[in-house]
Amino acid sequence: MPATLLRIHPENPPHSRIQQAVDVLRKGGVIIYPTDTVYGIGCDVTNAKAVEKVCRIKGIHPDKANLSFICSDLSHISDYAHGITTATYKVIKKALPGPFTFLFEASPKAPRFGGVKRKTVGIRVPDNQIILQLVKELGNPIVSTSVREDENTLEEYVTDPDLIFEKYRLLVDLVIDGGFGGNTPSTIVDCTNDDFELIRQGAGDIEQYL
């Protein structure tokens, strides 16, 4: 069955439409949604079959997938990551919500994708009301990966929800149109060694928070 295209106002998302997207996730669906950077593909972190579907869409094996978790706030972080020092927490609290993915050591509670225990986990709290309200209503983080196929190629379709819908409508269950997205990914920062190591420079400047 083709996906549904759901238009949601980016500044004032109606609760009824957020709930519609949450219902899809709770049924094991895969959705595409806006963030503060590039549109993402994701599902409920607790649904293993949905995670496998996300990986199939991206052409990656679950145990090798670099999937991040989108959280609504910092309260989820301790559930999936450990070893976060007070100094590190102060920095990420200032930086989030924002265009960053922070890498931490995975806690024992972190889901196993493909039956393999994760060593690290990427945490995202995007500055986007649609996805923040969606995750809050769901009550679980969303496993997330970018709709971009090639990080080194400028792909026109990734910024336009209508073009994204045309490309993915037979692969996912729902595409949220929250307006035009960006084409620059999040900045990835490794926090596993009590330091802030820049892995990928993206839309966010971590230096201003250090």
What feature does the model see in each segment?
Residues 1-210:
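Active-site-adjacent structural elements in enzyme catalytic cores
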